[in-house]
Amino acid sequence: MKNAFLRWWGCGAFDVILDDVNFAFDPYLFGQNLEGIEPCYDYIFISHEHFDHCHPKTLQKLCRGERFKKLFVNPGCITPALPIDEKYGDAAFDRDLPITKHVAPEKVEVLYPKYLQDDGQWNRKFHGPFELDLGSLNVETIESGENQTPDLPTCGYLVTHKEKQISFLHIGDLHHPYPALRELRDKVDFFIHMKLGLTEWQGSNLTDRLVEIVELVRPKYFIPTHYRTDRIADPIPEGHWPPNVTDTCAFIELIREAIGEQTQVLPFTAGVEYELEMPDKKVIWKWNWHNSWSVPPWREG
């Protein structure tokens, strides 16, 4: 079995290269990364209509070519709340939506969440589809939070490769865990995490939410994403969403301290491709020394 490759591209963008099938969640690329990337995905999954998750410039580049088959989106990417610029503020724009302005309509399919965040106040029912059989892949949907209105749900995705028995859960901008997520328990290998349950220094303590969702789902591995650093090599340019984390090590260790006994936290660096040894699904950690000088400046005293 060939090894797999994973990459967090910054913000909530994440891709999975399995050789026989490749897919991406919420691609959001800039500069050389956007210019240089070739359409290599069979499927792309979009959690919601906010600009940093449903990014027209990136999707225009990726949703084409012989390999590409379908862009799966939540309803708001096609029928956003109106008027867009008023309802979404700086989170979405009339220039961008519906996404069929930028991607051929026949290449776009709307999905609805199978597992809902309802607490009894909305009593919603959607007509679906909620699941997909894509040959080698099976897809289930969850509600992922930041709904603009109750009838415009957002989507997280559990994507499972049947033969390789490897699965990825992308939760979108989910803020609160909810009981229906228990249905995913022990189905998830890699949990791609974004906002939920993060407690910054001297901020509101939200860690119980993080502990709760990990207990509900019980993933094997947990990958923190949706933050930026001040690295020159960070794939999201300075001045773009999301905000910087001031101390990445402290950020990761606080997460590890909260949930480390329940799952293994994988501290991915944005923009770096990580190889998975298959079928063990084990990350091969690679690093080397890299001199930041050509002529040592200390020679001059």
Segments from the language model and where they lie:
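Active-site metal-binding motif and surrounding structural segment of the metallo-beta-lactamase
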Residues: 29-80, 185-192
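Metallo-beta-lactamase
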Residues: 160-211, 216, 225-233
